[in-house]
Amino acid sequence: MLSSLLAVFIGGGMGSVLRWAISMKMNPLNAHIPLGTLAVNLLGGFIIGLAIAIFSRLTHLDPTWKLLITTGFCGGLTTFSTFSLEVVYLLQDGRFMWALANMLLNLAGSLVMTLLAFMLVVWINGQ
């Protein structure tokens, strides 16, 4: 249990620092699209797909490595990678409508919650 916690902790720290560094370098490059955020989301999706493919074939590897890379590193880099993997699993299972629903709910839900949180802060500050 302790090794699992440490793996997630270390991987998460590494992913978070990388996300920050990439965002600091790339976001100022374009005023319309946060390129750093896009880059880490795409990178995270690629890494988690690569990791799952590798770990499914190399079953002798210690599961702690999977935790470090997927839950820790990719989770720290972006939660978008986990979402992407879940959609891929739904598509692989032939559950296309559920994959679409999952995509729409995650994207729209996240945007709505972000907007609601922003509006709440504006409302509280206006009181």
From Swiss-Prot:
Reactions mediated catalytically? fluoride(in) = fluoride(out)
| Principal subcellular localization | membrane
Record keywords, A-Z: Cell inner membrane, Cell membrane, Ion channel, Ion transport, Membrane, Metal-binding, Sodium, Transmembrane, Transmembrane helix, Transport
Name of the protein: Fluoride-specific ion channel FluC
This protein's membrane topology, according to the annotation, is:
Multi-pass membrane protein
Annotated GO CC locations: plasma membrane
* Cell compartments where the protein resides: Cell inner membrane
Main function:
Fluoride-specific ion channel. Important for reducing fluoride concentration in the cell, thus reducing its toxicity.
Regulation of its function: Na(+) is not transported, but it plays an essential structural role and its presence is essential for fluoride channel function.
- Which GO molecular function annotations are given, in alphabetical order? fluoride channel activity; metal ion binding
Organism taxonomic ancestry: Bacteria, Pseudomonadati, Pseudomonadota, Gammaproteobacteria, Enterobacterales
Q: Which domain of life is it from?
A: Bacteria
Gene Ontology biological process terms from the UniProt entry: cellular detoxification of fluoride
Similarity annotation: Belongs to the fluoride channel Fluc/FEX (TC 1.A.43) family.
